[in-house]
Amino acid sequence: MVWLEQPDDFAKPWKLRRIGTHDPDALTGLNFADIDGDGDQDIITGGYSQAPRDHDGDEVTRDGHLGRLAWFANPGDPTAAWTRHDISRRKRGMFDKFLPRDMDGDGDVDFVSTRGNSAPYDGVFWLEQVRTAEPVASFERAREVDSVEMPLPTRER
């Protein structure tokens, strides 16, 4: 994922700025919001799984294309590296639409999102942001049963 910086002089080429990657997972959707509350635009992203749509089989392993949710923290400096924060990675699902809203009125941005291609788990879901002094990996699912949670790949490409 990259962004293009428009130069002040229209005769000059645009600058290509790297943000990050979901590799090996396919990036299918994104949206912008100030996720960390520092005043700049961060990016939430979703990925698309190539696993079967109707079961959590062994066809796709941790190094295959899986459904991933992550967000990238904007460093504030266009030349600095963005930091990826993984939220969830599942055997089944396509996470592609993200609406930033403060759903619980606590002053931070949450996301209403959609999930598809993972019957019977398709639908609309809410990613609630809970702020802590230090980052804490936390994902509370709303269902008792869901597609298998998968670890990150053995190596990122």
Q: What spans do the regions from the language model cover?
A:
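Beta-propeller-forming repeat regions
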Residues: 1-157
